[in-house]
């Protein structure tokens, strides 16, 4: 489910991005608003082909080689993601998968399934520097703090291009 397809972003030197709906965290600092907090009444469903076409049109218009979906959690609709990545694999683009890493950390097979995609880069967002800070920032169970780290390990183990993005709080 998406709010819009193909908006230009300045990140990574220019990216065409679709605005996703739905997340498994409720971060205090989240800018997404309705896509996260009101997913039932926000956006509409698109096929992977429609999403790819929207991203491709925006990327061509702005001269971008990178495409992504952001503003929510991109790993929740796994089959949709795989079908979208199949389309990207046969294109000139690189897909940036932005994720909080929870699903990847919980399921090593997910990372293995992503390993076949060579036009994929995964950006795992690490939220906080401790279990307590993570819980305070995301509302998630402190014990799930380890999952993004496990997800990064799973990705590295199977050779998926990836990096960590660390969000820290200076509130203490």
Predicted segment positions?
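Generic hydrophobic, aliphatic-rich segments that mediate packing or membrane embedding
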Residues: 14, 19, 23-26, 47, ...
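Pocket-edge positions in alpha/beta enzyme catalytic cores
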Residues: 15, 40-43, 140
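Short connector loops/turns at beta-strand edges and beta->alpha or beta->beta junctions
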Residues: 23-24, 35, 126-131
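"Short basic amphipathic alpha-helical interaction patches in structured regions
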Residues: 31-35, 44, 82, 138-139
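Conserved alpha-helical substructure of the radical SAM core
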Residues: 34-67
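Conserved AdoMet/S-adenosylmethionine-binding subsite of the radical SAM
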Residues: 56-66, 71-172
């Amino acid at each position: 489910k998406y709010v819009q397809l193909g908006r230009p972003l300045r990140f990574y030197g220019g990216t065409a991005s679709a605005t996703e709906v739905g997340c498994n965290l409720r971060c205090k600092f989240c800018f997404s608003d309705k896509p996260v907090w009101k997913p039932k009444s926000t956006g509409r469903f698109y096929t992977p082909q429609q999403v790819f076409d929207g991203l491709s049109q925006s990327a061509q218009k702005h001269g971008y080689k990178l495409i992504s979906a952001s503003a929510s959690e991109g790993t929740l609709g796994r089959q949709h993601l795989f079908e979208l990545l199949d389309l990207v694999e046969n294109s000139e683009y690189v897909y940036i998968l932005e994720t909080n890493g929870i699903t990847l950390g919980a399921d090593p097979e997910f990372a293995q399934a992503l390993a076949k995609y060579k036009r994929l880069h995964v950006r795992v967002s690490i939220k906080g520097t401790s279990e307590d800070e993570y819980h305070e920032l995301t509302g998630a169970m402190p014990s799930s703090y380890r999952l993004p780290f496990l997800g990064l390990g799973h990705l590295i183990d199977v050779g998926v291009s990836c990096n960590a993005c660390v969000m820290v709080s200076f509130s203490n």
